[in-house]
Amino acid sequence: MYLLRLPEHPGCYLYSEHNARNADNFLVVLDEIISLFDMYMPAREELPLRVSLVRSEESPCCFRGSHEIYLNTEIQYVSQAAYQFSHELCHYRIPYLVAENLKWLEESICETASHFYMRRLAHILSVKSNHTALKEYAPRFVSYSENVLKDCRKVDLHSPLQIRRMELNWYLREENRCVAGQLLPLFETRPVLWQAVPFLGDIPPEFGLPDSFMIWKKISPAVCRQAIEEMQSIF
């Protein structure tokens, strides 16, 4: 096994059975996604990170305590890796546990992250001449995202019953994708909203959704507050 340092992020590593030469494109994808997160959703605290490829029922997942992210993919599947890594890195950059009644919102936002960052990644790679293979591959990140979003189940976000259903089971993936599909245009037009996401875990657990949005708006950077109000109107 190899512990491969990401070239642009010295504190981040890929634990892989492949050497750096064979994992080059994979490393570039991880590196670029972290750089995009640094731009839009900066970490509240700089932490090391080890990414491992783990085929198991619990993967993909992140472990904040041990600074690890597991991806359930193979080194050649860079679109799948980008999709999973963006989702898990979104979780990883929320430093505190999110209240159980808001975990569905966290899951839906992290699903949104997959699609937002894959599309930004496609643009970055399409203009980079030093990674020819990934430059040619770049449009596939967008098509992968589009295909995933099609696999969703419609959710009425103004229905208290449907919100309650997601509160009780926040891993309803088809519903998460539906919510993500409705959040994505807002994040694309108001990317400053990503700066508020790390503060989701600061919202106390005893509040309902309207009050939680109010608290989230107060504790987030001032530049995000209008965008949070716009998100609340979706629900």
What are these language model-derived features?
Residues M1, D151-F235:
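Pan-zinc metallopeptidase signature
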Residues R5-Q76:
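Auxiliary, metal-adjacent structural segments of Zn-dependent hydrolase domains
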Residues S16-F26, Y96-N101, N169-W170:
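Second-shell loop/turn segments in exported
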Residues F26-V29, A82, E106, E175:
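Hydrophobic (often cysteine-bearing) scaffold residues that line and stabilize catalytic clefts
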Residues A43-L53, L97-K103, L121-H131, Q195-F199:
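Surface-exposed patches in mature extracellular/periplasmic domains of secreted proteins
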Residues E68-F85, Y96-L105:
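Short pre-active-site segment immediately N-terminal to the catalytic Zn-binding motif
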Residues F85-L97, I109, A113:
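Active-site His/Glu-centered metal-binding helix of metallohydrolases
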Residues W104-L149:
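Post-HExxH zinc-binding segment in Zn-dependent metallohydrolases
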